[in-house]
Amino acid sequence: QRQMCIRDRVYVAPNSRFDKELTGGEDRYYHLVLLAENNKGYENLMKIVSRGFTEGYYYKPRVDMELLQEYHEGIIALSACLAGEVQRYIQKGLVDEAKKAALKYQDCFGKGNYFLELQDHGLPEQKLVNTTLLQMSRELDIPMVVTNDVHYTYADDVKPHDILLCLQTGKKLSDEDRMRYEGGQYYVKSEEEMKGLFPYAWEAVENTQRIADRCHVEIEFGVTKLPKFDVPEGYNCLLYTSP
């Protein structure tokens, strides 16, 4: 058995996961990070992701609050990047809506299981969002955590990653209007680097390790866990599965 920290970034539909039509100006989905705190959380995470694919697929496999409430047990949630629901509202100047969204997620996952996520990749909009998140954390008593959005391992991987991004999206490096990750800060940063970015949020820095320490998922390897199907009397496996 090996202890792991298993997580997934899910896409949360603005309303129901079954809705395939959007009203004017509405986002298709919001990002949300889910971590399995224990084996029950791992089971619930698999159910959330699976039903997002089978029931909520619209551009992305989307989930909704109904699913999150049904399978919240054993899961720690982070508010994600600038594409998270709380952050989206802040960027639009809708701070009251951002507060409502944060409380909605805290009510869903439980106090101490939902964290407002601070990131700093040198983007101007992150400075504004982080300032507001700090105020919201104090006002609403919702804990914070610092993270770095990672898309490549080392700092000098930025150029190869940009080339791969062009291959993926069918663009050229010389194209101005294309997807790119500006600033070269999307790599795995050291503890010292992260502390240097957030000298004003020591509690949030320490929460990064506290969350990791809480995650205890144990997966047993080397054991086949396929479901067993009994063959009806009078059949063998080959005969029963033949067309």
Q: Where do the language-model regions lie?
A:
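Phosphodiester-processing cores and adjacent nucleic acid-binding clamps
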Residues: 3, 7-242
